[in-house]
Amino acid sequence: MEMARAHLFIRGKVQGVFFRQSMKEVATRNGVRGWVRNRSDGRTVEAVLEGPRDAVLKVIEWARVGPPGARVEDVEVRWEEYKGEFQDFRILPTF
């Protein structure tokens, strides 16, 4: 099983629409670990995903649409070296 790590920047109407909580649920359901947080610009959510490549890709595909009420304009994906540093998926404070 190929493991992967992706660093995402999701832009649009993605704050105040339960994006972080919804992403946590989707990631956990797919066995993906990492974190998600709002950025202080008010229109970006940042996330780091780690897990089996297929599962990470599923979460990225979900992020392109997001939860009801979100309007995703862009998802920037930066593939990084897998580190295996997370035990679960967390919502972090705004940065």
From Swiss-Prot:
Q: Lineage of this protein's species?
A: Archaea, Thermoproteota, Thermoprotei, Thermoproteales, Thermoproteaceae
Protein name (record) = Acylphosphatase
Q: List, alphabetically, the SUPFAM superfamilies matched.
A: Acylphosphatase/BLUF domain-like
Q: Does the keyword Heme apply?
A: no
Catalytic center residues: R20, N38
Q: Which domain of life is it from?
A: Archaea
Q: Which InterPro entries match?
A: Acylphosphatase, Acylphosphatase-like_dom, Acylphosphatase-like_dom_sf, Acylphosphatase_CS
Q: Which reaction does it catalyse?
A: an acyl phosphate + H2O = a carboxylate + phosphate + H(+)
Q: Where is the Acylphosphatase-like domain?
A: 5-93
Note one Pfam family from the annotation. Answer: Acylphosphatase
| Stretches that traverse the bilayer | none
Going by the UniProt record, its keywords in alphabetical order are:
Hydrolase
**UniProt-recorded Gene Ontology molecular function terms:** acylphosphatase activity
Coiled-coil spans in chain: none
The answer to whether UniProt assigns keyword Iron to this entry is no
Q: Gene of origin?
A: acyP
The Swiss-Prot or TrEMBL record describes its family as follows: Belongs to the acylphosphatase family.
Fetch the PROSITE patterns from UniProt. ACYLPHOSPHATASE_1 (PS00150), ACYLPHOSPHATASE_3 (PS51160)
Task: Quote the EC number.
Answer: 3.6.1.7
